Amino acid sequence: MADLKDILLDKLREARAGVVASLDGLGEYDARRPITATGTNLLGLVKHLVGVEHVYLGESFGRTPPDVLPWVADGSIWQNADMWATADESREHLLALYERAWAHSDATVAALDLDAPGSVPHWPAERRATTLGFLLVRMVEETGHHAGHADICRELIDGRSRSGNDEFGADWWREYVATVQRAADAFGPGSS
């Protein structure tokens, strides 16, 4: 049986791959435009996860991240500057930052035991003390959460999903959506 740390790291790697795969084949506009009412966009998810990896699996264990992130250094992270790509931030640049953050995080996980103590600098003082195990689970959760966002955003852009929805074909999906809509309509305006 695999070691728990290995299992968690494998799940983190799967979630990271899902986030990155959501960008496959998209032009710059679709990679960065807001898809939801709150501005969620694919490159913004990547950019956000760079910073989260830096803090949770780097700084929290006294390990200096490989890059200085301008949106962290200038404090604009607190105005959501980590959730969208500026015109000066290319896809290649943000993906390279993410890959370096992965390598740094993976090295932290390899170097420490799951019960190694850490401290998250921006958490309230009474909750700041934590462990690698807790933050690794948190990172799997955070990345999986945003991989789901990325999957939905991609589906809204061009109908593609990493969940394999292409195998059924457009006609099947139209009928399926119509079936789901009919079920919902039974509870729509005027229903009892």
Regions found by a protein language model. Give the residues of each.
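Helix-loop segments that flank and shape redox-cofactor active sites
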Residues: 17-41, 59, 63-71, 80, ...
